[in-house]
Amino acid sequence: MESGHLLWALLFMQSLWPQLTDGATRVYYLGIRDVQWNYAPKGRNVITNQPLDSDIVASSFLKSDKNRIGGTYKKTIYKEYKDDSYTDEVAQPAWLGFLGPVLQAEVGDVILIHLKNFATRPYTIHPHGVFYEKDSEGSLYPDGSSGPLKADDSVPPGGSHIYNWTIPEGHAPTDADPACLTWIYHSHVDAPRDIATGLIGPLITCKRGALDGNSPPQRQDVDHDFFLLFSVVDENLSWHLNENIATYCSDPASVDKEDETFQESNRMHAINGFVFGNLPELNMCAQKRVAWHLFGMGNEIDVHTAFFHGQMLTTRGHHTDVANIFPATFVTAEMVPWEPGTWLISCQVNSHFRDGMQALYKVKSCSMAPPVDLLTGKVRQYFIEAHEIQWDYGPMGHDGSTGKNLREPGSISDKFFQKSSSRIGGTYWKVRYEAFQDETFQEKMHLEEDRHLGILGPVIRAEVGDTIQVVFYNRASQPFSMQPHGVFYEKDYEGTVYNDGSSYPGLVAKPFEKVTYRWTVPPHAGPTAQDPACLTWMYFSAADPIRDTNSGLVGPLLVCRAGALGADGKQKGVDKEFFLLFTVLDENKSWYSNANQAAAMLDFRLLSEDIEGFQDSNRMHAINGFLFSNLPRLDMCKGDTVAWHLLGLGTETDVHGVMFQGNTVQLQGMRKGAAMLFPHTFVMAIMQPDNLGTFEIYCQAGSHREAGMRAIYNVSQCPGHQATPRQRYQAARIYYIMAEEVEWDYCPDRSWEREWHNQSEKDSYGYIFLSNKDGLLGSRYKKAVFREYTDGTFRIPRPRTGPEEHLGILGPLIKGEVGDILTVVFKNNASRPYSVHAHGVLESTTVWPLAAEPGEVVTYQWNIPERSGPGPNDSACVSWIYYSAVDPIKDMYSGLVGPLAICQKGILEPHGGRSDMDREFALLFLIFDENKSWYLEENVATHGSQDPGSINLQDETFLESNKMHAINGKLYANLRGLTMYQGERVAWYMLAMGQDVDLHTIHFHAESFLYRNGENYRADVVDLFPGTFEVVEMVASNPGTWLMHCHVTDHVHAGMETLFTVFSRTEHLSPLTVITKETEKAVPPRDIEEGNVKMLGMQIPIKNVEMLASVLVAISVTLLLVVLALGGVVWYQHRQRKLRRNRRSILDDSFKLLSFKQ
């Protein structure tokens, strides 16, 4: 049997007995209790060492007032007890905060949770990462179950329930995973509100032997274990909001719960429920192994970059000093701290940093010998000055992509470049890091290849073993510093200011002062074996990180393996290097805001009338400080190896999907069309361009692209360059696709939503999206969709059979292999021009986009070169997307979008299915913004009130009502067709597009999956962002109907959830029945393909049947031998007991005889 078939066969055998365990039974007694929780028990901002009264920002959250709650709230949390009397509480570490106790288990173990609810409303406990049946899911939603299977869904006040969870091999950490995986548990009656109320805790599942036999168990592979929740805890969603207002506001009647400033004061930017450094100290020893279990929860604003100052983390084999955390994202990071001291942990998202998401951790020497100095490399000296300049965001004066004047009236660019008595225009005072030749700071360094750096400082480069020495001269008017990522430094050289208890509260240069920084690159700071040869990092000023970086002080830093840099300091094996910073530079938060307003001679009377519009005009959506393709053109040759070093910075809206039009890139050996950036994250993407022409680099988030976050790169055929071998293609597959206009219903059946919420219509979360009352449009909209036809006559639609039913609004799943030519014959049967444009493929047209007018037929040819298919670390197939690109934003929101999968050669079978999978599902998670559809006015006329003119299209409620939080165009479990059999191999193509709010963390209940990045990693949540396309694979193991949903709070309530069903193996014998509230549909089993036979629920090639039978026979014989051996042991024990009884009987008789004789 081939290794791939053997692997899947063994995985399937494992799924046959998911609950067979050979480990311990770990029993926990958890009580749900109401408590009073203080987010800042020390009563001050610990980071700045300021009392609340003198800290304006901290006091806005923590000081109570007549209409402010302050820093103390009633919450409901999980507590652990020693037994079922629930009287003797188990003490928890103080730093765990309001989190529930840490639940721990190994593979093969059973976890029994005795849950008792001492609170005043129903709650549950629902886990991630473990196996459970319906009676232990702890999640309330309509799933067709009843009776005892629903008892776990809602434990009433005073009630109790026992939850039974197991950790079978199908949920175990993989070989590539760390010894223990990070998960969570939480209440799931109304999950967003339950969690906001406080019901959440950590859970780890470990490999066998990772835990010792103590109670509670301790890990044997690490010395310290820490669990941190990063979350903007929204107390406005707490079940106790009204009670908290009544208790803590001195004038409760004056409170307006809809007031935005009141709501903001209740959003606590917390780590484990503590803000502004109030988290009790996290202590550890230098040179000891530390495991950090990091997780997030919350809403769209919960984009977190946790920065560990002074140390290095390892996650999934890669070195980093930051961790990206999103709602229901779990990160397991390992650290061996080297530098003693008190260090900062902070979320580097600007607004979160400002609002208190910071804590301290302390590394003690613990009498350890100081580490051996392993710095055997060079001392690399840099002379860098902070220099104030006037910066022009659009020096060309026109859009480099379209040629239009930036100040063209009515254009989007005019909003940013208009110069008037109420607008500054495109030129601002800023400050920039600049490189000089020596310590005299007389002669600047000018390199032609650095022209594209723009506002960025010079590139600092070093290899492992090197020392970086930076002489920093602050020639600006504010104190500034230099704080690096990715290198080591002692406390004396740290560039961030905070209260660490030392005499060095941050090395900062005052105006016209020089300071020297010393950073080192020991071996444990360099790239790992899984990392590329060079790692991309960043340095920035952190005297005031938010104002300093918005003023312009940021630059790139490159750390490479020893020998990776040439004599000229450039990376070997790379022809071109480009460093690009994607950020919305907020000039309102610059040190020079007042100076810029004064220089523009603004009329402050006009400003006061439109302060919001003025502030928005100062938020510059820039790449290296340039908008609308004004970045100097990035030139390269066809076949070059190009390294793109990408940097992120900013606030929670700075979620950037960096798209490379015309060519693809590799990230860590995985093929991508986009690289995701968040504040203080860094990515290196490798491109080998094979597509000649001029293309855009842009942020995929639609509003960012519209606002000018675009640049141009050019690929030329250069003389003297060795021609790359020409890829050979062969005609392979033809698709006939029509754009047709339909009436689309996002939620044709509201029964699931109504049963789930069990509320009146107006009180339902879905009312605003689904009602057609009060001037709202309801759930039905005119849209345009891609649909497949049988041939070029476009007369017979290709029917969507069972496997395609789930596609919903999406066009057909187009598939190809490397080396194929895909031909798409497109007929536009809609009422306006549309096109078909695909990511990832090599489009043969020289005109982009090639549009079809209404009634016109256009043929597209897509070649599939090697760089379109899976990279060395990818799965067998990678997912892409296609859509109409005449107006990419309006066309897509109108409905014209579909999935595309490109596979390795030989993976696809003649009928188009994958030979290595039994099922394939393509899911698009997108907030369809009907306000940006071409058909908005028609929809208002058709579905609005009788007088369409009475509807205010800019009304906030109306705008929100038209944002449909959909999975394949359906809300509230209306998507059908996600059905599979137990033991089947399932590939999920997970797609996301849209805006910065399209942050989606998708959780599969009851199942885990494998995510491939060179190695396989276990997860049950996949993170999606605009322009990201992921492939995850699972073996369906748990029969039942289960929930799949986005874990972002607002998205849950808005209906971004659906059901998938796993049918048991016995149901293979009968038609597969999908029960809905509308009708019952029978979906016949898939046909058995020629040359295959069906065994164990799988289609097995005939040539492998004998081998699989042999494996099954061997397993059967092994089990038989085990049974015989156990039987022998039992017989032997029984015989020994019988002999002992006989001996005792003989002895008794002997004693009696002796007694008688005496």
Curated annotation (Swiss-Prot):
Major location category of this protein: membrane
Binding site for Cu(2+) 5: 656, 699, 704, 709
Binding site for Na(+) 2: 416, 425, 428, 617
Glycosylation-annotated residues: 164, 236, 588, 714, 758, 829, 873, 931
Binding site for Na(+) 3: 769, 778
Sorted UniProt keywords: Calcium, Cell membrane, Disulfide bond, Glycoprotein, Ion transport, Iron, Iron transport, Membrane, Metal-binding, Oxidoreductase, Phosphoprotein, Repeat, Signal, Sodium, Transmembrane, Transmembrane helix, Transport
Positions bound to Cu(2+) 4: 304, 347, 352
Catalysis: reaction(s): 4 Fe(2+) + O2 + 4 H(+) = 4 Fe(3+) + 2 H2O
Residues bound to Ca(2+): 134, 152-153
Co-factor remark: Binds 6 Cu cations per monomer.
Cofactor(s) this protein cannot do without: Cu cation
Protein name in UniProt: Hephaestin
Gene name tied to this protein: HEPH
